[in-house]
Amino acid sequence: KMCGVTQNWESYESTKKASQLNLTPEQQRFPQRYIKLGIFVDHGMYTKYSGNSERITKRVHQMINNINMMCRALNIVTTLSLLEIWSEKDLITVQASAPTTLTLFGAWRETVLLNRTSHDHAQLLTATIFNGNVIGRAPVGGMCDPKRSVAIVRDHNAIVFVVAVTMTHEMGHNLGNHHDEDKCNCNTCIMSKVLSRQPSKYFSECSKDYYQTFLTNHNFQCILNAPLRTDTVSTPVSGNELLEAGEDCDCGSPANPCCDAATCKLRPGAQCGEGLCCDQCRFTSAGTECRAARSECDIAESCAGQSADCPTDDFHRNGQPCLNNHGYCYNGNCPIMFYQCIALFGSNATVGQDGCFDANDIGHKYFHCRKDNEKYIPCAPQDVKCGRLFCTYIYDIDLCRYDDSANGMVAQGTKCADGKVCNSNRQCADVNTAY
């Protein structure tokens, strides 16, 4: 299974090495994000490959290159920040129960791992056969959370690409994606419920919409900035679109006019090989816009003229009024319920009446403010507009409509009253102290 759905292939033809994809105009709708991965190989997988750490390392690097290729459709660059092989013993108890193992791995990351290394998302690769033939599991929307920014994946196929699809699928869940439904018209795409005999390297339009909505509502902080070269574990084969220690440029193709494929050094006369501020092997002139402002809460960045990199993505201070005082800036966006309703239910949607939100004081699976130890915590009366989002249609204002997924909760930073916003604990807090 993938996340509890049956695996249905018997064989798979050898796949060609993943090729690099150029960004399409469609991908420009997503802001650039960077995910630093920590990969942990359990002792069972170490034993499976006869203790050959070099073979395992090469296999993991190939997986990362495939993941990076697939994530380009979301304008995400993935880097291997940490690779740890548990050659002596497992550092957690890897059980046949996938939910239990995921919980243990998340707790270990929060209490042990984050104290000794920096990364954004951790995955455990295991040889353990999980109950129900599950091959992967991850929390939906857990990215950047100390305990929930994790996934577990069984090394279930000899073909690297097939396992990499599963790893990308689980990371997709962490980024807010749910399984593709029938209406998505893509039964082989990355977020499909079932991993097909020939899995696709593409995200469906449904997945892209989910990611865009979730990114707008949450704007994960840990994946905003590009990794340093010293943050990246060097790969045996270059051409991964990442600059690693010792490289001037990424030497993936001998045809690259800026970069010498044999040495990963710049060709004579070249200032740069790639980057938002690199044009025809030269630094773009100072003042050239390299990242447009995506909202009135964001700040456009311009090239400095001395580097190929676009400056760090910056934005106006949190709490600054926006959209004619209908909202407050939060991490470069202006989250308001009206636009969240449109994202969920279309252009005829608007915010539901105040009475709809009173359901959030029930403490139900769908109507609550928080969840603690599997118990749903009801919203306090003053916090009901920070729980489940209720919408309606302009032609039927008495309707209380909601989306029961994670995307259906009111986004953090959303205005819940005059001078107040929803904080990370789903409380309607003073805008001056909420962040």
UniProtKB/Swiss-Prot annotation:
Cofactor annotation remark: Binds 1 zinc ion per subunit.
Positions glycosylated per UniProt: 115
GO MF entries: metal ion binding; metalloendopeptidase activity; toxin activity
Modifications the protein undergoes after translation, according to the UniProt entry: The N-terminus of the metalloproteinase is blocked.
Tissue specificity comment: Expressed by the venom gland.
In-chain residues carrying the UniProt-annotated modification Pyrrolidone carboxylic acid: 27
Compartment annotation: Secreted
InterPro entries associated with the record: ADAM_Cys-rich, Disintegrin_CS, Disintegrin_dom, Disintegrin_dom_sf, MetalloPept_cat_dom_sf, Peptidase_M12B, Reprolysin_adamalysin
Coiled coil (UniProt feature): none
Positions of the pro-segment in this chain: 1-26, 228-243
EC number, as in UniProt: 3.4.24.-
Location (main, coarse): secreted
Annotated catalytic residues: 170
Pfam families: ADAM_CR, Disintegrin, Reprolysin
Subunit note: Monomer.
Its job: Disintegrin: inhibits platelet aggregation induced by ADP, thrombin, platelet-activating factor and collagen. Acts by inhibiting fibrinogen interaction with platelet receptors GPIIb/GPIIIa (ITGA2B/ITGB3).
Protein family membership: Belongs to the venom metalloproteinase (M12B) family. P-III subfamily. P-IIIb sub-subfamily.
Name of the protein described by the UniProt record: Zinc metalloproteinase/disintegrin
